């Protein structure tokens, strides 16, 4: 298994470790619910060094990004980030990712850990405009410091005014005495906070400084288990569950990152444009259970008569709502908020109601 600069410290702290996307990663420390609530109410630190980072450089950098991603990067100012996806040639999604506009002719793509090799091959094979591509995944470490107290803690460690960095914006500066740290106002938790990108050799300096600075706020390390429950409470999609090679961004409710701007001829644009105009045969919806139970990935979704109308893609017991929540694909007529649906849990059909995400307001 691959390791991150923080693997040894996770083990030393007693984390429950497990393989994830080929990496030995911490799933939980003190327990998923405790860690979840730490982030919602205070501040927690996630090791997300397993994520992938690709640099796109040169005069044709923007042209390349426009040809392989669904969102419109031509309107992305310097110092801003954008959520987008790589559409595939069958109407599905290669991966969802973030694009950072780093310099006038330099962009950073941040991709999912489980898709690094697939994404890299996709980018290289679709680089018809001669952009300069660099896979720096193994040379980049990343921590996500999330929660309402994150900014307060991190401000003690940098001369950069964190309050001046709007959501989905970033700066590169000094942090904990380390140079060239990307400080990004982004996250996958809905609780606020920052993501830091830095050299692996600076990893433990930054880790130790953050935990020392955050002692008064009761800062804790957080595992991937709580990362999943936090993102699900926000209705954020997870690749491999809610998105994959067969789900289109239109079906997944990601029409807002699928821009049909003039001259933006990304992969399979015509098919996605057709879907937007004519409609789709299934839609991703969010739902809350009205009865006791926990929906899980792969459970069937039924109508009142027991007819199967879809499938659960993500589900959990919400630590904040204290009820079962989930997302799944259903026939479009069942995707509207307020619609009653039923989740097949073992031998029972548990009543649920479609809601508008996020679950945690």
UniProtKB/Swiss-Prot annotation:
EC class name: transferase
Organism superkingdom: Bacteria
Keywords annotated in UniProt: Aminotransferase, Transferase
Keyword Transferase: yes
E.C. designation(s): 2.1.2.10
Pfam family name, one: GCV_T
InterPro entries membership: GCS_T, GCS_T_bac, GCST_C, GCV_T_N, GcvT/YgfZ/DmdA, GcvT/YgfZ_C, TrmE/GcvT_dom1
Function, in words: The glycine cleavage system catalyzes the degradation of glycine.
HAMAP family to which the protein is assigned, alphabetical: GcvT
Name of the protein described by the UniProt record: Aminomethyltransferase
Lineage of source species: Bacteria, Pseudomonadati, Bacteroidota, Bacteroidia, Bacteroidales
